[in-house]
Amino acid sequence: MKPESFDLTIEQMFEFRRMQDATANISQEQALELLVQASRLLMIKSNVIRDLMRQAPLEPLG
């Protein structure tokens, strides 16, 4: 995997900054709830990727 794969796109950087600004003045309780929701979404994303990889046909490269 290329090191650039771990960089954010311009759009992702913009969205990240927008989230930082939007969450700057929330309570600790709200921040914890957002963290729990984000963790759940990351787990779902992992499950979807794993399922898609299982469904993908394996073909030789070249």
From Swiss-Prot:
Pfam families: NblA (PF04485). Coiled coil: none annotated. To Synechococcus PCC 7942 NblA and some, to chloroplast ycf18. This is Phycobilisome degradation protein NblA homolog 1. It comes from Synechocystis sp. (strain ATCC 27184 / PCC 6803 / Kazusa).
